[in-house]
Amino acid sequence: RAYIGIHIADINQELAKKLALNGVEGVLITDVLKDGAAKKAGIESYDVLISINDVEVNSVSQLHEQIIKFSPGDEIICQIKRNGILQTIEIELES
């Protein structure tokens, strides 16, 4: 099973306001696991994950639906927002 190495949360209006996010798109990365695939790729806590391989993820369940399509060793392209700036990060999934 593929593993990205993050803890995530759905973004609701209250959380978006608290974190000064523009809207509720994506999922909030609440923690990046030490030595995990996401950490190695440069993902940080409080980044907002917008999409994986051009498929939008707007809930924890949508993210899980995307990740299970992949195997350890596969590379995925993630769009994230950090401080309001969109970035593209490539992550090699682990097991």
Q: Where on the chain are the PLM-derived regions?
A:
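C-terminal recognition in membrane/secretory proteostasis and scaffolding
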Residues: 1-95
